[in-house]
């Protein structure tokens, strides 16, 4: 109650602000196009000078509203302006499907773009990034802003006038898409001023990635923004970076990007050398293990836990003395993955097998994700289980989660149709409140209480009866399923009944637009996995409103109430009539795992006979509470992973900051002095401080330096200070000699060398961290806090990595040999071939290793891109 009172208070404040915007807008109505453009230029100077956007919100929003009216023939409703205000304030605007989020975003985008630091509009796919940039482009161009678009495969564009001369003429002669004298709320296409529509057409022009980021507004996908950040931190020249900072971002479908995908990091990866035969061997071994005897399955956490009998059995079959010995950790992972593949990952639910490949099915949308792969060897374990060719496992070069990427922005906002149920997570993780924006027209969809059956068989029979009843009267039905397997089961049942229908699931997604377009037509029955809906509009056909509108039938509840609300939201858009009803059974995964006992008791008390459903508001409430419980569990998992990644994020920032320092430094003398000092002082302190002098151990610890560099004799030094000075001076003298030998190219050579050393150590560190994550999760079963354990281990590991980086740099700068420009070019080309992948779904990338491995074989030299180092 308090939350909704708070929402009302916010909306009341917004309503007053909208009233003020409306007043300014009415003053702008009489102004010429050229005057609006001049006002925009003046406003940009004001905002840019003081970087204070709040003060100019009313004028900016009114300008955008009038520009949209003239260039698009669309005037944002008051509720859309409210949504825009929420976005400007860094909140999540919950706006129902069909309420015009894309247009609402133009106002805060314009206002914040005036500051000059760049605004990012984040969409979920390339098509939407291009579509929205083109759709809203005329508004920004009219007001003097540049608009860029970033797509995958390195494609980047700028939105430009299709006919610049005609656009100029339209501005000079005061043309408007909205005709004079039209006072309605919505301007239909046939009533638009056709001449102005033609004049304000835009198109995409190819530009460089860097230019796209230099635009005032940049549209792109969450993946591409994240990958560009990671790629920027692998460059060998600062000028090759494309992003210019993280100022303000609006994330479309914020719940999907910031919550559902929060656990799946973006990764730049390369191939591992694990043999495919290992995965096949463990796929066979896993079949010998008996569930509940050798291992237990935790379906809630989606993990496998070996029993003592299982451990003994594994040690005997594999032929090791102790499965948990550090040297056997990889064998344990292989076994756990093989058991997961066999017992937790189901064909046609979690993945499909097509053309000899295992393709993941997105659990939230039901879409196929070709090219994406489970990480940590799990995908290979599934390939071994299914008997298809096994592709290489990958190792990580750079990684970041969406949580940590988007938290880098000075200001972050989001928009979606379903967010209120996740408000606590938005607040705790991102510091964003959720504001529920009212619909423009009242929502009249009727949501029925759930029908619960004892078995899935009874449930599906009743669903088919319900579909048949509505089909006979001509009411369109959209049936939502949670997997391909279930959509095809239902389809076969409808075929037996002779009910014509269309199926929309991951296997047929190419026809999605065509199928969805028909879903609201009279007599149409559509079966769809969760994929159908986001970004697609189901319009009612003639006579359908009179039949009650589109009827949504849910075949089971999802773990998240949000996903159910998205399914419901496909009916009753923009004030249309509609209905929704969920059919459930005690055998559904959600109820079976989390609540069948409670609901079963209720059914026994009420003496519900077989085949008879129970339908009661109290039962719907009980199921909602089960979902809340599961949402809490999932949030807890995400929070644990976030806390682990927060540790990694601080370390990542430290490493990337070090890279930037090296990229920007004009002279490395001071930096290398610090490194030599660190290398010398740590060793002198360890082996030759006080009375305990161990010259032999000191010699061994310095043996990685070029032979003959030090002439150590215990009698030469009267104190550890004298020894320290001798060692430091020898390193410094050799460095100066090497610097003179290489000549003017030395800075470039050293820069390439140091960057490659840092990148190589960071890659190895990330690989080790993945093993630590797995290990600390196993320790949690021994009552140890995994977060505390993770922090403790990674603190020492990171410290050790930084020490090794210093040692390696100190050693290699004294061994460097100048090489040709050709090698530099080749190294850059190889770096450019890096492919970027989205984890839990991991693609393999060979590029980075090839650059160095090929050169290692030449001349006994160790290669780091442009430079070679004598062994």
UniProtKB/Swiss-Prot annotation:
* Any Gene Ontology biological process: protein import
The record's section on CDD domains has: DEXDc_SecA, SF2_C_secA
Query: Lyase as a keyword?
Result: no
This protein's membrane topology, according to the annotation, is: Peripheral membrane protein
Reaction catalyzed: ATP + H2O + cellular proteinSide 1 = ADP + phosphate + cellular proteinSide 2
Q: Name a GO molecular-function annotation.
A: ATP binding
Which compartment or compartments is the protein found in?
Cell inner membrane; Cytoplasm
This enzyme's EC code(s): 7.4.2.8
CC per GO annotation: cell envelope Sec protein transport complex; cytoplasm; plasma membrane
Q: Keywords on this record? A: ATP-binding, Cell inner membrane, Cell membrane, Cytoplasm, Membrane, Nucleotide-binding, Protein transport, Translocase, Translocation, Transport
The residues that the entry says bind ATP are 80, 98-102, 537
Q: Which InterPro entries match?
A: Helicase_ATP-bd, Helicase_C-like, P-loop_NTPase, SecA, SecA_CS, SecA_DEAD, SecA_motor_DEAD, SecA_preprotein_X-link_dom
A Pfam family this protein belongs to?
SecA_PP_bind
> Can the keyword Cell inner membrane be found in this entry's annotation?
yes
- Major site of localization recorded for this protein: membrane
Subunit and interaction comment: Monomer and homodimer. Part of the essential Sec protein translocation apparatus which comprises SecA, SecYEG and auxiliary proteins SecDF. Other proteins may also be involved. A single SecA monomer interacts with SecY in the channel.
Q: Which family does it belong to?
A: Belongs to the SecA family.
Question: What role is this protein assigned?
Answer: Part of the Sec protein translocase complex. Interacts with the SecYEG preprotein conducting channel. Has a central role in coupling the hydrolysis of ATP to the transfer of proteins into and across the cell membrane, serving as an ATP-driven molecular motor driving the stepwise translocation of polypeptide chains across the membrane.
Which protein is depicted?
Protein translocase subunit SecA
Q: What is the lineage of its organism?
A: Bacteria, Thermotogati, Thermotogota, Thermotogae, Thermotogales
Q: Which gene encodes it?
A: secA
